[in-house]
Amino acid sequence: PSLSNPAMVLIDGTSGEVVYEKNAFSQRKPASVMKVFAGAVAIKHLDMQSRFTTNISLGVNEKTLVIQGSNDPWISLSHSVAEKMDRASLPYLAFNTLSAVKKSNKGSLKGITILYSKLYSQDVSNLKAFWAKRGFKPVMKAVSSDETLLNAGEFIVGDESPEIFKILDYTIMWSENNLSERLARLSARAAGNSFSDKGVAQVFEALLVEYGIDPSKLVTKDASGLSKENRITASMMGQPLYQLRKDPKYSLLYESLPVGGVSGTLRSRFLTTAPGAVGLVRAKTGTLNGTVTLAGYVESTDREYVFVTLADDISRGAKSSAKARAAIDRLLGRIAAPNIPAVISETPTTP
């Protein structure tokens, strides 16, 4: 079969009754369905209206620069991607900084110290690499936010991100891995945990516990779902999806989910596989080699259902993934149809 013994659960969105389940408590790879947890903890712990700022200035002391960061997840590592999406890019900030250093030091790039706060280690590494290629090798020194504030002089270049709710919407809609990782770490820190994968694991577990769900089968190695060592169960994902849907605070998560045949990572799904379900499915997609997952909501005639499908034992390769996606689409097509079948099978009925 296309789905090769998947883990599945179908929950009545009105009553919370489990309508169908298969391997619902079996540990499976979530792939990017993991981002549902990242989105939920971001809404819970971060101010959705706030923005991130990054400001770069000449230092008050000679031969110093100051970068006042705020762990902005939105700054793109790629300039071309940034231009397409109207985002600031690390190369843009780095280039403008380099020009200002030359101007203030009569063309010299030697003996410069950069004091910085709240930058991701990956961003620091990328800045160093960008500058090193251009002959600029400053001493980079991590300091507190207060210290950068005290040492900042003439402003050079900066950026302000959109509100966090817009960043989260993009993250879920397009399954952006880097943003998911960074938002989850920010959420972990806001919840009082460490700014690390371990902190993320703790904040995900706390979310489950809050809804009375046993987190013992959750294995969190990252927040994006890229790690093949992540593990969830279909029930563990389905129950929070049911609970979150009832809480107006989490409406943003629901609205950010791609719509089948219409938007985001589901824009090309259902169009040929289950045309009757186009516009009726809102869900988070997931794909790894040998794994295809989907979790979210499907509208039927008189109610909405919560569903989770974790097929993590399919054959490797693009063809198998495409077949698995089509099989999941057809299943949801049958649920979206006027009468929900008494038994959900993996094999589509032939007309």
Residue ranges, per PLM feature:
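Beta-lactamase-like hydrolase cores
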Residues: P1-Q27, Q49, L90, N96-K106, ...
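Soluble periplasmic/extracytoplasmic beta-strand elements of cell-envelope proteins
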Residues: A7-I11, V19-E21, F37, N55-S57, ...
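Solvent-exposed coil/turn segments that connect beta secondary-structure elements
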Residues: G13-S15, N23-S26, G59-N61, S70-D72, ...
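Active-site SXXK
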Residues: G16, P30-M48, T171, F307
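Small-residue-rich helix-loop
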Residues: V19-E21, A190-P351
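Short, well-structured active-site flanking segments
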Residues: H45-E62, V139-V143, Y250-E255
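Conserved catalytic neighborhood of penicillin-recognizing serine enzymes
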Residues: N61-N96, E154-A184
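A small/polar active-site loop signature that marks catalytic segments
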Residues: S99-L252, S256
